[in-house]
């Protein structure tokens, strides 16, 4: 094995990463530093400390990254109205660059020469973690146990844990049949019955949202205040970024908003079915497009829409820390200078309905757009010349016999 003195492990305290911790100690004979991120996944993270201590770990990091996650990663992504392949709001993808960043920061603080993660060799996360790590610390060593060991089933992991005295729950409360990932933006479900693309997902799978059919019969209205493209207040009450998202998750979940069942194209080449709950993100996407509709210039809005799929792909495939993503982010952020105002929404049985938008910087001019008498604000006769000039190239082509029918 490569010479490794100290490694920082992205550690959840679960079976996989607990086995990895012991495996690193035995295989590399190295000191392990554990890092557990609180990204709003809704589970207690402190038990990870006790588990790590019981396994001889002396340097343990448990960091509350919720505000940084939403402020510096989720909000910048939503300024671009980012959606991967038309549906996926990138809840897992956007969390990985922050974890990679913190892994490298801790490696620098502790003098570690390697990092390790529990991502499998089949998924996107291995790419996301490692591209981020190499961008931030080019010489770092990366240990990916799932690409090295022969513990390729849950049963083998549990046998290894029992053999080495790692606390596990082989019996007890029923384990979810799905592979799940959660943070403040979303919760995802993969595997189990979802591996058959024709099988309908089970209703009791969902954790955050009620079924739209069982959502309240009375709609709820909500006002979101924007400043430079980011939400700063809900119903007039100013909130921090993480509080905004947590509140929207709760309200959206109550109204059955944000469920997805999709098949996506993984970066490693395979197709994968996943179900997602993103109630707050679904509301934010709809509201942000609404405030941009009155504050962005037409060509700026269209250019953003053209670039968004590329931006989304960069995030999905792990290139958050790349120069091209940073370049696109500067352009996106510059476009948000005038994206200020308030959007009013109606939430009803899984639907997010825009019912109003207003801004002191609105480019909507009712005097020009009106269907009534406009007092000469717009001369309709000007449209004739506009149309003729735009038709000129097509008329020339037609005169040359280049007819389309």
Swiss-Prot record:
UniProt binding sites for L-citrulline: 88, 93, 124, 128, 179, 188, 264, 276
Keywords annotated in UniProt:
Amino-acid biosynthesis, Arginine biosynthesis, ATP-binding, Cytoplasm, Ligase, Nucleotide-binding
Question: Cytoplasm as a keyword?
Answer: yes
**UniProt: L-aspartate binding residues:** 120, 124-125
Q: Could you say which residues bind ATP here?
A: 10-18, 37, 118
What pathway is it annotated to? Amino-acid biosynthesis; L-arginine biosynthesis; L-arginine from L-ornithine and carbamoyl phosphate: step 2/3
Q: Supply the Gene3D superfamilies for this chain.
A: Argininosuccinate synthetase, chain A, domain 2, HUPs, Single helix bin
Quaternary structure?
Homotetramer.
Q: What name goes with this protein?
A: Argininosuccinate synthase
Q: Which organism is it from?
A: Pseudomonas fluorescens (strain ATCC BAA-477 / NRRL B-23932 / Pf-5)
